[in-house]
Amino acid sequence: MNPALPRHIAVLKGGPSEEREISLRTAKAVEDALSSLGYEISSIDVTTEKFEIPRDAEICFLCIHGSFGEDGQIQRLLMRRGIPFTGSDASSSEKAFDKAWSKTLFIKGGIPTPPFCVVGDGKKIPFDPPYVIKPSRQGSSIGIEFVYDIKELDQAIKKSTQYDHVVLAEALITGKELTVGILDGKALPVVEIKPKEGFYDYHHKYTKGASTYFCPAPLTVDQTSAVQKTALDAFNVLGCSVYGRVDIILSDNGIPWVLEINTIPGMTETSLFPMAAKASGMNFAQLCEKILEISYLRWKAHG
């Protein structure tokens, strides 16, 4: 345990979103890791805004995925209470969670991102299929539909609308599925994702053996550099901080297309962020403590 860091950590987990079960798995792994280093842990299952944090808990380790955890809500509540927490602030979390907003900012910042538009109410999509239809504010590939024939579009939009009233149509870019962890302003080794079949959906993300991963990804030096730079640029464009994960498709013509940023990436037994950290020489407990350290020092410096 680092004596310069708070001893008592409140781990906030659960939440009301579709990603609740993944959050509980992330929290369990984080709690076990920090406990093994000697930290005192208060595990708090957050179901409403009226959660209680022990008075002597000195910082919150946020493990809530999806709405209320990654959309800026819980960060804003903690900021009002004057309680330190891990990860990005409320504003950058909100931008990253809203795909329509973040992709608009990527375009303004010169970051490659697949063409997209908000759909519904009879709006015409200004590019041809295939499309990826997705809720603007949802994570873990929940609510995503693939459309290859325009006849399938209305049904796909209807399905995605179950998860958010704002739905995007995005051009389907084919290529290598990659993800890049960002930690303390630096890009971690790139991970390549190969689902055993189909696309990297919720099932392939959280089922052991459903996907194969390569870390570091088998890319050329130039490809690796371009992917890491693009990921870091995207992270900075949204004002994110401490840590996160950037999902990218590297197309056959060498363009790294940014799909989205996860400000509270999964930390489960199948998660990619810890895999990338391990490839850089950092075990899971060290990673959790590093996130704690960066977040706490940032809070002390800026509040």
Swiss-Prot record:
Organism: Methylacidiphilum infernorum (isolate V4) (Methylokorus infernorum (strain V4))
Cofactor note: Binds 2 magnesium or manganese ions per subunit.
Task of the protein: Cell wall formation.
Intracellular or extracellular location(s): Cytoplasm
Binding residue positions for ATP: 130-179
ATP-grasp domain: residues covered: 103-293
Reactions it catalyzes: 2 D-alanine + ATP = D-alanyl-D-alanine + ADP + phosphate + H(+)
Binding site for Mg(2+) 2: 260, 262
GO molecular function, one term: metal ion binding
HAMAP family: Dala_Dala_lig
Protein encoded by which gene: ddl
Residues involved in Mg(2+) 1 binding: 247, 260
Pathway membership: Cell wall biogenesis; peptidoglycan biosynthesis
Cofactors required: Mg(2+); Mn(2+)
Superkingdom field: Bacteria
GO cellular component terms, A-Z: cytoplasm
UniProt protein name: D-alanine--D-alanine ligase
Enzyme Commission number, as recorded: 6.3.2.4
InterPro entries: ATP-grasp, ATP_grasp_subdomain_1, D-Ala_lig_Van_CS, D_ala_D_ala, Dala_Dala_lig_C, PreATP-grasp_dom_sf
PANTHER family to which the protein is assigned, alphabetical: D-ALANINE--D-ALANINE LIGASE (PTHR23132), D-ALANINE--D-ALANINE LIGASE B (PTHR23132:SF23)
Pfam families documented for this protein: Dala_Dala_lig_C (PF07478)
GO biological process terms held by the UniProt record: cell wall organization; peptidoglycan biosynthetic process; regulation of cell shape
Keywords: ATP-binding, Cell shape, Cell wall biogenesis/degradation, Cytoplasm, Ligase, Magnesium, Manganese, Metal-binding, Nucleotide-binding, Peptidoglycan synthesis
